[in-house]
């Protein structure tokens, strides 16, 4: 099959890349290759009784699959340039924050509505820190929680699944040019 765009990985970068490409150019033929399983098939065998620790599965359902390594996290999304990455070094602080807020809006639209956005800016705690020569980093944090984080991923997949070809359990080890494609 030939694709206009082939995305490697269905973690947040791959999911949001596919999402934006679908929105901006719905005629593109998009494929996503993911080493792990679909979200609904991601199951870790550790159960605390018969399997108490990692058994080294060929494909780790905690680290790989739709949603990436954060799929089963507590769903905290930081909106800040003060920590967590250096995107702002490439596109500027305002643009980086605007993009983080845009991702937050998408998360809200796909199941995260009703969750709380916390902030350190302008708080009594921030003032107390300054008075005591402590330097609290400014951040807004959306706390979706584990369950809502999963719902957001389910809803994003439901939106994308008929617009993008997902190929799960398809690790990519190398890329080679074949004719005019790869």
Predicted stretch roles:
Residues 77, 181-182:
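Hydrophobic residues embedded in beta-strands of well-ordered beta-sheets
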Residues 7-9, 17, 75, 156:
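Conserved structural-core and active-site-/substrate-pathway-adjacent residues in large, well-folded domains
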Residues 1-13, 31-33:
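Beta1/beta-strand and adjacent pyrophosphate-binding region of the FAD-binding site
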Residues 18, 22-23:
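Gly/Ala-rich phosphate-binding loop of Rossmann-like dinucleotide-binding domains
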Residues 144, 168-181:
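A conserved short coil-to-beta-strand element within the FAD-binding core of flavoproteins
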Residues 30, 166-168:
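Generic structural signal for residues in well-ordered beta-strands
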Residues 27-34, 39:
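Short beta-strand "acidic-cap" motif of Rossmann-like dinucleotide-binding folds
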Residues 38-42, 46-163:
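Conserved N-terminal/central alpha/beta ligand/cofactor-binding core
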């Amino acid at each position: 099959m030939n694709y206009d765009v082939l995305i490697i990985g269905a973690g947040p970068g791959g999911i949001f890349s596919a999402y934006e490409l679908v929105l901006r150019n719905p005629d593109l033929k998009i494929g996503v290759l993911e080493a792990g399983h679909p979200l609904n098939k991601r199951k870790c065998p550790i159960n605390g009784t018969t399997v108490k620790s990692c058994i080294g599965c060929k494909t780790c359902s905690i680290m790989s699959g739709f949603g990436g390594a954060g799929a089963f996290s507590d769903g905290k999304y930081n909106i800040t340039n003060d920590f967590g990455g250096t995107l702002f070094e490439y596109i500027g602080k305002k643009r980086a924050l605007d993009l983080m807020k845009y991702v937050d809006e998408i998360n809200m639209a796909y199941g995260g509505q009703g969750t709380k956005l916390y902030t350190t800016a302008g708080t009594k705690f921030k003032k107390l820190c300054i008075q005591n020569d402590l330097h609290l980093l400014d951040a807004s944090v959306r706390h979706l929680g584990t369950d809502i984080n999963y719902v957001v991923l389910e809803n994003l997949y439901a939106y994308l699944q008929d617009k993008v070809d997902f190929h799960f359990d398809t690790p990519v080890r190398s890329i080679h040019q074949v004719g005019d494609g790869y």
